[in-house]
Amino acid sequence: MDNKEVTLNDADVIEVKKNYFFDGLSCPVPVYLRLSQGHYLVIAKPNEKALFSSLNSFANAQSRVFVEKVHYDTFIRFVTSLTESMIGNETLPAVTKAKYVQGLSHHVIQLFENKKFSNEQQLTRVSSLVLKLSQSVSGFGEIEKILSALPNDDAKHSMATCFIAIMIAEEMEITQGQVFEKLSMACLLHDIGLHYIPNEFLKKPRHDWTPEEHAHYESHPIKGIEALRDLKEVTQDVLIMIVEHHENALGTGFPKKIRDVKISPLGRILIVANYFADLLFERVNGAQSYDAPLAIEFIENVLGQPFNKQVFRALKNIIILNEMKKRIDNAK
């Protein structure tokens, strides 16, 4: 293709990761490389195969790639779909898959940034840790196949839950690599049981569910461990966390309505991370979404803080420290 220069308003474009792109990729939207302020080079036209390796400027480590903001959602849906198909392709090398999972992680990072949760440097570090752990787990390819069967929103929710849980664990000074591995796996797999729940009522607002539909939904932690228990890579500790992820300290959760003292230590972290991710990202149909500080207030003032005190305190500390950092940065 002929690469031509165009003039664009810098406020109308958004940066995307270069590792999304490879020779022969046919992207559904135009892709640009920034030359200078307001000046861009078209490096991919919609639905045309691009040859990125032929561009010296693309190979430059300092070069940055953009799409127009109006096309960003379309681009991310395309990348997510491509990621899922790559994960299920056994002929592709792990390093290629990792690049795309990393791209999806970057999208989750941007969602977090918009919700005022932590900072990009910390989230990027957690993203790298999640990828490292997932690649180090024996047989993780089988787990990736299961994950790829989930809808995009559920996959993003699982990744977001994983990010939050690891940051909470670090705030609680939990440092053992094996613990992070188990926690990450449980977070990524905790909603596998939803795959066995009919979509008809999952798409409805929860206040419209019948008692039978509520009961069906509340069975999904059990269905999840039933689907996973034959995988030798999924340990008993991980299965316990998965079945506990909708419990709470008061004993009013599901499916077993157990109190805090009977919930596993890592299960307490997954429970808080899962609920907090739901509040941030409008995952529940008909529910309001919150930025991070307001989500903390909602848990305290509306729910009456029904979670383990130490875990919730760690989450709150992360939010408070991040807000303080932003105020200091803004005052400079």
Specify the residue positions occupied by each region the protein language model found.
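Phosphate/pyrophosphate-binding active-site loops
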Residues: E212-E213, K223-G224, F281, L294-A295
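A short secondary-structure junction motif
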Residues: L133, V137, I192-N199, H245-T252, ...
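Histidine/acidic-rich helix-loop-helix segments that form or flank divalent-metal centers
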Residues: L183-C187, A215, L228-I271, N285-Q288, ...
